[in-house]
C-alpha cells in the first residue's frame, strides 16, 4: 500500500534511515539535549530488553479487517497475561451511541454493564458521528471497581487520556 508520498511505508522508512534530516536530528539530540537518540525510538527487541511494552498496537482481524488502534500502555498490567497479551472473552454489548453506552455503565438495574463484558460502540466513525471522542466512556470505566476488566471496541476515536483496553478506529466503520 502506498502512502501520501507515493511510496510504500518501507521505502519511506529506508529513506529516513539515511536522510540528512535524521542525521541532523540525532546529532541535535545528542549534542544539545544530551539524549542518546537510540533511547528515544527503539525497535521491539531493544524495548523488550529494557522492560518496555509497545505504546500503540495496530491489530487487524475478523472484527477489524482494515485495522484498528490500541493504546497498549493504557491497559492495566494486572489484566495482561504472562505472554504480554490482553485477552477477554465475554458477552459483547453493542450500542449505537456513547450516550446509550453511558446508560448501561450508570444503571443500577439488570442492564448494568458487568465485569468481563465487552462494550461495543458503533456508528462513531467518519461517516457516523464524525470520529467523536469517547473519553466519557473510558473515564466512567476507570471509576468502576471492575472497569479494567471491560474492553471497549469502537469505530470512534480516543483521547490521549483514555485508559483501559480500548480498541478504536476500527475499520471498516459500522456505517461503511
Spans of model-derived segments:
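Catalytic or ion-coupling anion/metal-binding cores of large enzyme and transporter domains
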Residues: 1-165, 169-176
Amino acid at each position: 500500500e502506498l502512502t501520501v508520498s507515493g511510496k510504500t511505508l518501507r521505502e519511506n522508512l529506508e529513506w529516513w534511515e539515511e536522510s540528512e534530516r535524521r542525521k541532523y536530528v540525532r546529532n541535535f539530540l545528542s549534542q544539545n539535549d544530551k539524549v542518546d537518540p537510540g533511547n528515544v525510538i527503539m525497535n521491539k527487541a531493544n524495548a523488550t530488553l529494557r522492560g518496555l511494552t509497545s505504546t500503540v498496537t495496530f491489530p487487524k482481524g475478523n472484527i477489524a479487517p482494515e485495522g484498528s488502534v490500541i493504546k497498549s500502555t493504557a491497559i492495566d498490567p494486572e489484566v495482561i497475561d504472562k505472554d504480554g497479551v490482553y485477552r477477554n472473552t465475554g458477552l459483547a454489548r453493542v450500542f449505537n451511541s456513547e450516550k446509550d453506552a453511558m446508560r448501561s455503565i450508570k444503571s443500577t438495574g439488570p442492564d448494568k454493564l458487568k465485569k468481563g463484558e465487552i462494550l461495543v460502540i458503533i456508528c462513531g466513525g467518519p461517516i457516523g458521528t464524525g470520529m467523536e471522542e469517547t473519553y466519557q466512556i473510558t473515564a466512567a470505566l476507570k471509576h468502576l471497581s471492575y472497569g479494567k476488566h471491560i474492553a471497549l471496541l469502537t469505530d470512534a476515536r480516543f483521547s490521549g487520556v483514555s485508559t483501559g483496553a480500548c480498541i478504536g478506529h476500527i475499520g471498516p466503520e459500522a456505517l461503511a
